[in-house]
């Protein structure tokens, strides 16, 4: 399964804000306890608000079956974002990429 994980600017931490505002994503192939990094994707939409941003992210992160981040959408019920992303998502309490990969069941990473 191809997974996109929201990264902080340092590339090691998990972005603490909404998934769509992350500066970049680590894309991994997760299979049978092994996780292989495929690429890092810069987010050109990080500063955009509302509109069709979820669809733009879906196109940016083509082929991902799961998005992992600290938050999805905004807590404000009047915010213009869609209530849920167009790809299945998983909230994480992980603070680092390594912790998030462990939550996904990764026994080994490459």
PLM-predicted stretches and their roles:
Residues 57-88:
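Mid-chain, well-packed structural core segment of small domains
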Residues 1-52, 63, 88-110:
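Non-catalytic interface/targeting segments
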